[in-house]
């Protein structure tokens, strides 16, 4: 899939976030990357054979105190090649992009992987 098309899928997934949540994402940058770097894989605790579809790097809203401010934006990376590798069709890519964006946005709101499992997000 061309990068521009993939980027539009990510933008559509972000645009579908309800306004009450989107309003709390003013210091979050969402990036499309081909694949994770070695450092990003290490940060996520991902082994060399595992796939990393997305990554949130920053300070979740639940961890911010009154001291928080004047900081670089949190970052959400969405990895195109990783997502394409686990999908068999464009429809699956569309759904996986949506799922991955929402998963990483959930981390921004302080929801960890264990809680996402409990909520049935997987």
Question: What feature does the model see in each segment?
Answer:
Residues 96-104:
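Short alpha-helical catalytic segment bearing the HExxH-like zincin motif
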Residues 1-96, 108, 112-117:
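Active-site rim/adjacent substrate-binding subdomains
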Residues 118-122:
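Short hydrophobic/aromatic patches at helix-to-coil boundaries
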């Amino acid at each position: 899939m061309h990068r521009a098309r993939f980027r539009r899928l990510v933008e559509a997934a972000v645009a579908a976030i309800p306004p009450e949540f989107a309003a709390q994402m003013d210091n979050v940058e969402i990036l499309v990357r081909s694949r994770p770097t070695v450092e990003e894989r290490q940060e996520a605790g991902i082994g060399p054979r595992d796939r990393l579809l997305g990554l949130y790097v920053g300070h979740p809203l639940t961890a911010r105190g009154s001291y928080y401010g004047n900081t670089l934006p949190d970052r959400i990376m969405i990895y195109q090649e990783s997502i394409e590798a686990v999908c068999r069709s464009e429809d699956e890519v569309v759904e996986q992009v949506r799922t991955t964006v929402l998963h990483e946005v959930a981390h921004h709101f302080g929801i960890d992987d264990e809680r996402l499992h409990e909520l049935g997000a997987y």
